[in-house]
UniProtKB/Swiss-Prot annotation:
The modification Phosphotyrosine is found at residues 10, 258, 540. PROSITE patterns: ATPASE_E1_E2. It comes from the Eukaryota. Its main location: membrane. The keyword Cytoplasm does not apply. The keyword DNA-binding does not apply. The modification Phosphoserine is found at residues 16, 38, 45, 226, 450, 482, 666, 941. The lineage of its organism: Eukaryota, Metazoa, Chordata, Craniata, Vertebrata. It comes from Equus caballus (Horse). InterPro entries: ATPase_P-typ_cation-transptr_C, ATPase_P-typ_cation-transptr_N, ATPase_P-typ_cyto_dom_N, ATPase_P-typ_P_site, ATPase_P-typ_TM_dom_sf, ATPase_P-typ_transduc_dom_A_sf, Cation_transp_ATPase_P-type, HAD-like_sf. Mg(2+) binds at residues 715, 719. It catalyses: K(+)(out) + Na(+)(in) + ATP + H2O = K(+)(in) + Na(+)(out) + ADP + phosphate + H(+). This is Sodium/potassium-transporting ATPase subunit alpha-1. ATP binds at residue 485.
């Protein structure tokens, strides 16, 4: 990049340039993440390496030089991602989204009070109260949300490893253990099995060293490390060990080539933490909703402002009306309701092992339409398990279930006894100490994955392997290496009827078979003829085709005359036979699917969610697991399957004929975005195998280009860019790395894919329930606003006061609205397609038309009916009320006449008016009963859904009790200007309540009977 030579030309545009720079940097970072790692230290010879880093390959750096480098480069640690200061987080909760609307309302109230105080001698304090209450609501709910998020981030903090890592370095020719943060470039470092690699190392000597690279490359098998340069790609070559991967076995020495943020791991972490996650769908929905509500409020306010001027009110009165209408339109209680709904769901999910870091992420999961899932540990159990054996010329199935409830096989065969003996003896894995009381499958093992699988299998089937090894003491062994691909050991044989030395060997099946001349069948040795070789080949191909890792086993009794007791076996200059052995059988292993996964994948499919597997593993294994868990469903073929069935080359098959598709990482590398889009569009079932972490990011972007809302699961550092880019990143709590947990929005505490599906269901439920809650809350807006409008137009005494509106929004409506968050899912929740964020909004025109235009209008009628009844009982017939307002509200007029000629003083009139306010308020509570019950469902009948929601039933009683308390409690006349009512006045609104219930049940019945009809199109929100 240039050094900014053309800077002076653009001086005036500095501001926009800053924005563009930020954007350009974001795009640059994104491209950086998609690039493969570039470094050349693995290609250097040892001399060049020594010169480049100014170090000594045997004595290491001097202490003084190391101190200089540490001062220059800084500590060997990852820079923590930039955190948002707490006060900023708090302000976001106080002034973000919905809160802003309430703040504006509060300011308008204070403004109105100011105008009244300046112009009237005894101003009413309504607007002052209203402003104070609105401010209080925002502050309380803001604190509540802030507290919730702070709680989640506390749990996050606890994940961080508190133990400072140590590293063994050679300085001044002496070994010393130092804090890993003090390791510098050029240091000579020693690592052994069990250590975490402290920085990026170039290996200069190694002894049987293997590292677990799964968190970086996704390879589940431990990778050998040696001084040899074996691959151009630094991630694949054997002579580089990466920062924060673990050394599983063996020892190695290496020179530090990168530290801290400059390591491969550090680069990914830094770039990922810089990626911006977009706005969550629910935040966008709430913003959309605020626009609608504000639009309606301002439209009504301005309309009536103009109308009141036409009706010859003064300017000041018109402004007060304007503010009153805007404030009456703001659903004050809704902010608290939304926060509580999200919090409840987050708590519910925590109980089901999902930790939600960001409350809004809960809903995002519900609108997910594509899940890109890792294979190892998420879909599978993350432990190699013996799946099949082949002996006595047939395949036997082993039990791969997590609780050993599956199939078993014939364990009495003499061949099985020989096979299990070889698998137990020719095996370096051991159980760690003091685990006698732990179930065998759960025990910790020292050794590599395949050997642990064999150890556990033999321990389950044949009893203690340790006792077997004690009976057959090991004399010598040749460990497995990649050139001869076998492992061999010779043991003392306790059985007196057989020769006293037993040689056992295991390794790559074809290599083992080449060394055999006979085969064991039903305990008898037979010559290995072509027919049996074919049988072996078929079994090997069948097990390999299942994606299993197959090992061959053979043995040989060494004749006593050649190998008497005390014979000195030599493994360097081999003095015992390695040919003409006796083949015993095959054992194949796989990392089996978790028990709950196939069902979870099935649920995703019926919920219209596409599950894509993305793994670093081999295509055959990936495809086998995909078939095992139902990501590739039965009967669906890939291009290769079709080619094999029709016996034609793959190039002749039309890719559109194949529903399923397995894409190899190396093919993905050469694809254009258009080709990737084509695959994502035309195949319903996709597996990406042998992918690099960078490609995971490309796949996520591809899905998002299709308009999908993408959830990604991952546990490695390599997954963090994809986790950050996805609409919702899901990290693993047990196997996950710290970096991936920081990048994710949600953490699965049990690493189980099935928990994601629970999350999807909860996410959809929260969206449904928020809709219901909003529909319920908005409905009462109409009976709150119409009295005000009629008051302006028809000049009648005010039917409902500001204070009473607050009692509804923040009093009686609060608990019922929140209780809808506890409503159970309707029966079709996981059978629907995912919602389309473009068209299916949280608040749409249909919801507004139902709440405002239909149910709200019936409620307003109920309120007005009560109002007219009370005034008529007091002598003011409806016709007499028109135009009465001017005299009614004039405190100096004490002789207003009613329909019967009686005169009313100002005080008497006001008591009747406030009684009307109270009655109108009670009527709204009564019609809200029916509204609450109908809001329980959107499609099902309330009778189908039932009244199992105890909180909702409590809500009904609570709002009624509160209304009664406000009406009958002594002293309310002074405090809130609410007066006691005659019992009969409670019943005025009952018919309207019943009408609402019947009207809505009929509407839902028509929707169920005529799906897609006009009733559904016009009223189904």
């Amino acid at each position: 990049m240039g050094k900014g030579g053309g800077r002076d030309k653009y001086e005036p545009a500095a501001i926009s340039e800053h924005g563009n720079k930020k954007k350009a940097k974001k795009e640059r970072d994104m491209d950086e993440l998609k690039k493969e790692v570039s470094m050349d230290d693995h290609k250097l010879s040892l001399d060049e390496l020594q010169r480049k880093y100014g170090t000594d390959l045997s004595r290491g750096l001097t202490t003084a030089r190391a101190a200089e480098i540490l001062a220059r480069d800084g500590p060997n640690a990852l820079t923590p991602p930039p955190t948002t200061p707490e006060w900023v987080k708090f302000c976001r909760q106080l002034f973000g989204g919905f809160s802003m609307l309430l703040w504006i309302g509060a300011i308008l109230c204070f403004l109105a009070y100011g105008i009244q105080a300046a112009t009237e001698e005894e101003p009413q304090n309504d607007n002052l109260y209203l402003g104070v209450v609105l401010s209080a609501v925002v502050i309380i709910t803001g604190c509540f949300s802030y507290y919730q998020e702070a709680k989640s981030s506390k749990i996050m903090e606890s994940f961080k490893n508190m133990v400072p890592q140590q590293a063994l370095v050679v300085r001044n020719g002496e070994k010393m253990s130092i804090n890993a943060e003090e390791v510098v470039v050029g240091d000579l470092v020693e690592v052994k099995g069990g250590d975490r690699i402290p920085a990026d190392l170039r290996i200069i000597s190694a002894n049987g060293c293997k590292v677990d690279n799964s968190s970086l490359t996704g390879e589940s098998e431990p990778q050998t490390r040696s001084p040899d340069f074996t691959n151009e790609n630094p991630l694949e070559t054997r002579n580089i060990a990466f920062f924060s991967t673990n050394c599983v076995e063996g020892t190695a020495r290496g020179i530090v080539v990168y530290t801290g943020d400059r390591t491969v791991m550090g680069r990914i972490a830094t770039l990922a933490s810089g990626l911006e996650g977009g706005q969550t769908p629910i935040a966008a929905e709430i913003e959309h909703f605020i626009h609608i509500i504000t639009g309606v409020a301002v439209f009504l306010g301005v309309t009536f402002f103009i109308l009141s001027l036409i009706l010859e009110y003064t300017w000041l009165e018109a402004v007060i009306f304007l503010i009153g209408i805007i404030v009456a339109n703001v659903p004050e209680g809704l902010l608290a309701t939304v926060t509580v709904c999200l919090t409840l769901t987050a708590k519910r999910m925590a109980r089901k092992n999902c930790l939600v870091k960001n409350l809004e992420a809960v809903e995002t999961l519900g609108s997910t339409s594509t899940i890109c899932s890792d294979k190892t540990g998420t879909l599978t159990q993350n432990r190699m398990t013996v799946a099949h054996m082949w002996f006595d010329n047939q395949i036997h199935e082993a039990d791969t279930t997590e609780n050993q409830s599956g199939v078993s096989f014939d364990k009495t065969s003499a061949t099985w006894l020989s096979l299990s003996r070889i698998a137990g003896l020719c095996n370096r894995a051991v159980f760690q100490a003091n685990q006698e009381n732990i179930p065998i499958l759960k025990r910790a093992v020292a050794g590599d994955a395949s050997e642990s699988a064999l150890l556990k299998c033999i321990e389950l089937c044949c009893g203690s392997v340790k006792e077997m090894r004690d009976r057959y003491p090991k004399i010598v062994e040749i460990p497995f290496n990649s050139t001869n691909k076998y492992q061999l050991s010779i043991h003392k044989n306790p059985n007196t009827s057989e020769p006293q030395h037993l040689l056992v060997m295991k390794g790559a099946p074809e290599r083992i078979l080449d060394r055999c001349s006979s085969i064991l069948l039903n305990g008898k040795e037979q010559p290995l003829d072509e027919e049996l070789k074919d049988a072996f080949q078929n079994a090997y191909l069948e097990l390999g085709g299942l994606g299993e890792r197959v090992l061959g086993f053979c043995h040989l009794f060494l004749p006593d005359e050649q190998f008497p007791e005390g014979f000195q076996f030599d493994t360097d200059d081999v003095n015992f036979p390695l040919e003409n052995l006796c083949f015993v059988g095959l054992i194949s292993m796989i990392d089996p699917p978790r028990a709950a996964v196939p069902d979870a994948v099935g649920k995703c499919r019926s919920a219209g969610i596409k599950v894509i597997m993305v793994t670093g593993d081999h295509p055959i294994t990936a495809k086998a697991i995909a078939k095992g868990v139902g990501i590739i469903s039965e009967g669906n073929e890939t291009v290769e399957d079709i080619a094999a069935r029709l016996n034609i080359p793959v190039s002749q098959v039309n890719p559109r004929d194949a529903k399923a598709c397995v894409v190899h990482g190396s093919d993905l590398k050469d694809m254009t975005p258009e080709q990737l889009d084509d695959i994502l569009r035309h195949h319903t079932e996709i597996v990406f195998a042998r992918t690099s972490p960078q490609q995971k990011l490309i796949i996520v972007e591809g899905c998002q280009r299709q308009g999908a809302i993408v959830a990604v699961t991952g546990d490695g550092v390599n997954d963090s860019p994809a986790l950050k880019k996805a609409d919702i990143g899901v990290a693993m709590g047990i196997a996950g790395s710290d970096v991936s947990k920081q990048a994710a929005d949600m953490i699965l505490l049990d690493d189980n894919f099935a928990s994601i599906v629970t999350g999807v269901e909860e996410g959809r439920l929260i969206f449904d329930n928020l809709k219901k809650s909003i529909a319920y809350t908005l409905t009462s807006n109409i009976p709150e606003i119409t009295p005000f409008l009629i008051f302006i137009i028809a000049n009648i005494p005010l039917p409902l006061g500001t204070v009473t509106i607050l009692c509804i929004d923040l009093g009686t409506d609060m608990v019922p609205a929140i209780s809808l968050a506890y409503e159970q899912a309707e029966s079709d929740i996981m059978k629907r397609q995912p919602r389309n964020p473009q068209t299916d909004k949280l608040v749409n025109e249909r919801l507004i038309s139902m709440a405002y235009g239909q149910i709200g209008m019936i409620q307003a009628l109920g309120g007005f009916f009560t109002y007219f009844v009370i005034l008529a009982e007091n002598g003011f017939l409806p016709i007499h009320l028109l135009g009465l307002r001017v005299d009614w509200d004039d405190r100096w007029v004490n002789d207003v006449e009613d329909s019967y000629g009686q005169q009313w003083t100002y005080e008497q009139r006001k008591i009747v008016e406030f009684t009307c306010h109270t009655a109108f308020f009670v009527s709204i509570v009564v019609v809200q009963w029916a509204d609450l019950v109908i809001c329980k469902t959107r499609r099902n009948s309330v009778f189908q859904q039932g009244m199992k929601n105890k909180i909702l039933i409590f809500g009904l009683f609570e709002e009624t009790a509160l209304a009664a308390f406000l009406s009958y409690c002594p002293g309310m006349g002074v405090a809130l200007r609410m007066y006691p009512l005659k019992p009969t006045w409670w019943f005025c609104a009952f018919p309207y309540s019943l009408l609402i219930f019947v009207y809505d049940e009929v509407r839902k019945l028509i929707i169920r009977r005529r799906p897609g009809g006009w009733v559904e199109k016009e009223t189904y929100y």
